[in-house]
Amino acid sequence: MLCYENCVEFSCFENDLDAFIPEIWAKSALELLYENMVVAHLVNRQFENEVADYGDLVHAQRPADSKLRRRTDSTTASTLVQDAEASDIQVPLDQWFNQTFIIRPGEMSKSYVDLVSKYLAPRMKMIARGIDRILLGRVHEFLGTPATRAGVLAAMDEDNAYETMVEADKILNDKNAPTDGRSLILSSDAKSKMLLCDKFVKASERGDGGSALATAKLGHILGFDTYMAQNTNHCHTGADISADATETTYAAEYAGTIALASNTVQEGEYVNIAGNDQPTWATDQQTDTITLNEALKYAVENAAVVTIYKACDVDASLQTGTTYAAGYAERITLDGYTANKGPQVGQLLSFGKTAETRHTYTVIEVEAINTTSCYVLLDRPLEKAVADGDDLAFPGPYGSLCPAMCRDALSLVTRPLAAQNGAGMLTAVQDAYGIGVRVAMQDVINQGRVVSIDLLAGVAVLDEDQCVVVLA
């Protein structure tokens, strides 16, 4: 049940225009948002009832870490006292979600319940989807090294699913992550693969009596409360790829150059070598060899299939100075890819060809312009400028990036936007359970009533040791 901190109770009738009260709509908006979010319930949420604007830097708290102390009769108090304050980090409020719509005069006589169902519910589902996508979109920041991630890309099956989860559990334990409150968030593909494994569905081996199978949920697996989220990072087949093959065998942990048969790789492109199956990319390309950004995790056979995820072009021609500046938060135009093989929602997208210049995002929305160009919206504003023609975009590899995490790995930080009453506009700001929503209403002559819903937020990585990425 939602607990409202700043709500006023109103009553309205089914066909009463008094139902157009912003406070009532804001309360319903929060209820719908709360019901439709998945990932936001599994992370740290921080809210303060202080009005903020888009782009403001606000302070979030990272839980403090204390050390073991031993006391004797002669121990002085000064050596025992530890700082109990959580460390402070700055978080930009760079996620401004908005849904605006018009209720036409002919619709305004409908009941409040009908108006909510037709207009408000689908908009709040869209905002909930956006919140989950920006949270899951930060999963790449936890990829770490081959030793600190579990599984293989696009190759989870009934034979290795259990071992993958054992590996993820061990990695978190080795990082001293809390053992309580762990969550595993799976893509639909990863869930379907896990359900093929007997150890996840047999009651005697699950440890939960098998009730999860009866309710079509994965339930509690190896210490993880397990969920399927449709917004989990995942790239399906159909990406713009080319194929190559290795020229010899390579041992696990090999970190040198890799010889390819034809070598059409460009620096910066994601390259997946069968047998290794990690989210690797090329940092160097010579006539017949490439160098990857990290050592191989697993051994690679001779003539192993090499999948190259082809770069596409950045088109900033509509921007002043033909550059998407650092901090740019709107749609980015990409083109130059093979017809109908553009970037996908949930796919990684990187810029930069070296470790120093690389910055990586997740695509959270795609709108096609034509068969070879599209608009993409990223999980957060650009960290660095991207220039038209000079910079390439590098779409990520097939497979899923599923976070296995504790609550304090990520934080959703929200602040209320200012109420703006006047000039025919009525506004209400409501908050509950660490989330604030603003609803504004204004009549437009002969047009109807414009309703605008806003939510201002930021996402912070609190502790990289509290999340491991499960590749699937």
Regions found by a protein language model. Name each.
Residues 2-91, 467:
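N-terminal "assembly arms/tails" that initiate or stabilize quaternary assembly
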Residues 42-54, 59-69, 159-204:
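Short, low-complexity, charged/polar segments at coil/turn and helix-coil boundaries
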Residues 85-111:
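Short acidic, glycine/tyrosine-flanked loop/strand segments centered on an H-E-D-like triad
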Residues 103, 440-472:
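Hydrophobic, glycine-enriched assembly/anchoring segments
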Residues 110-177, 188-191, 195, 283, ...:
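Alpha-helical scaffold segments that mediate packing/assembly in large oligomeric complexes
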Residues 156, 200-203, 213-388, 470:
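Autoprocessing Asn-cyclization modules and mimics
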Residues 376, 381-382, 393-414:
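Long, low-complexity, polar/charged, intrinsically disordered or flexibly structured peripheral segments
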Residues 431-440:
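A conserved acidic, glycine/proline-rich C-terminal tail/linker
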